[in-house]
Regions:
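A short glycine-rich beta-alpha junction/loop motif
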Residues: 8, 109-117, 148-175
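A short beta-sheet element
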Residues: 51, 73-137, 149, 156
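Amphipathic alpha-helical coiled-coil/heptad-repeat segments
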Residues: 1-4, 167-223
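Short coil/turn segments at secondary-structure boundaries
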Residues: 5-7, 38-45, 65, 145-147
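Non-catalytic DNA-recognition/assembly elements of restriction-modification systems
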Residues: 4-35, 162, 166-170, 174, ...
Length: 223
């Protein structure tokens, strides 16, 4: 960037613009361990419920739509979440993936299941920016170092408090969040179209092999 830079003081973040600050997430919000029941509580519709497994399979950076729901009568057994809250998966299979996170942008009532750590950020933190910052490469590197365990990897609130992110002024957070949202959406669309082309080419490849080895086409003249 064409701005004056400074050393963040954090090796894996490097230099940041002069007006940015590298801070522990415990300084920008409150972290708590969530409580919640099992997947057996899931129903087809009801209160949106984000489970730790959803953070690995469904939600990348941002939670825009729930895939799990519970009955309203079960809500007291779960941890309520609000718009802008960040959710971290507290357990996983690998150090590289531990602490996978996403920020809740659901505007309706919602909750989360167990094995989730919730960050309730201060009001001057933009949700979109936070979502991308918490699961960026520097953040993933730190979370991997914080992981504990072997067969199952865990990350705990006490370690996660020390996760450091680079935070710009509020107006820059909003601008960066919106820009990232638009540009990543374009990239995702290109990836989707490319994947469809790859899938089609694989189908044609398989069909060619099948036709050739069953005598349906003669490839001798192509040699």
């Amino acid at each position: 960037p064409n701005v004056k830079m400074k050393d963040s003081g954090v090796e894996w973040i490097g230099e940041v613009p002069e007006k940015w600050e590298a801070v522990k997430i415990s300084h920008i919000g409150k972290l708590t361990k969530a409580n919640g029941g099992s997947k057996q509580d899931n129903v087809d519709s009801g209160i949106s419920c984000i489970r730790y497994g959803d953070l690995y399979t469904t939600h990348e950076y941002i939670i825009r739509k729930s895939r799990s729901y519970i009955e309203e009568g079960k809500l007291d057994e779960y941890t309520a979440i609000q718009y802008g809250d960040a959710l971290f998966a507290a357990s996983g299979e690998t150090f590289e993936d531990i602490g996978r996170s996403a920020v809740n942008l659901l505007k309706e009532d919602a909750c989360c299941g167990g094995d989730v750590i919730v960050l309730k950020p201060s009001k001057d933190i933009d949700p979109l920016f936070l979502g991308y910052a918490l699961d960026s490469i520097p953040s993933k590197y730190q979370k991997a170092l914080m992981g504990r365990g072997y067969t199952v990897v865990h990350i705990y609130t006490e370690q996660l408090r020390d996760l450091i992110v680079a935070v710009p002024p509020s107006f820059e957070q909003k601008t960066i969040g919106i820009a990232l949202d638009r540009q990543t959406a374009r990239i995702d669309l290109i990836i989707e179209k490319t994947q469809r082309s790859i899938d089609l080419l694989r189908e044609r490849r398989s069909a060619l092999i099948t036709a050739a080895v069953t005598g349906q086409i003669d490839l001798r003249e192509t040699i």
